[in-house]
């Protein structure tokens, strides 16, 4: 799922275990949109040259090389699921503080209905 949030291109997906992932929506090699690529296991494979990234944005495979270049990857954005909402932090990851998120306990009440989707 591709979204532009606060001017940043982000690709969102879920791992096989259902964990939500948010990564920068571009391959580190040629900036090909990873949202136009494919998921394999818990990672994403660039549709241009096949670079494979894990769910943390680390480059874990390059088809044309035996070893991956060190320090190459894409930005991983911290996120948190609370009820039916997914909160993403686009700033400095060291400053992400889940305690600052607004509390919305009624969103999880059994008699409460929520509309889902992108608004």
Identify the residue ranges that each predicted region occupies.
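Rieske [2Fe-2S] iron-sulfur-binding subdomain
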Residues: 1-20, 40-41, 52-119
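Short, solvent-exposed loop/edge-beta patches enriched in aromatic
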Residues: 15-16, 28-30
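A glycine-rich beta-to-alpha transition motif near the start of alpha/beta enzyme domains, typified by
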Residues: 24
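Detector for the c-type heme attachment site
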Residues: 30, 50-52
């Amino acid at each position: 799922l591709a979204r532009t949030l606060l001017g940043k291109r982000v690709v969102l997906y879920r791992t096989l275990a259902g964990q939500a992932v948010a990564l920068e929506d571009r391959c580190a090699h040629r900036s090909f949109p990873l949202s136009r690529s494919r998921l394999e296991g818990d990672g994403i494979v660039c549709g241009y040259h096949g670079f494979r990234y894990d769910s943390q944005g680390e480059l874990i495979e390059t088809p044309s090389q035996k070893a991956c270049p060190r320090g190459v990857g894409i930005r991983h954005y911290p996120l948190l699921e609370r009820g039916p909402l997914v909160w993403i932090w686009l700033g400095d990851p060291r400053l992400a503080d889940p305690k600052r998120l607004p509390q919305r306990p009624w969103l999880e009440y059994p008699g409460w209905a929520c509309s889902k989707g992108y608004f």
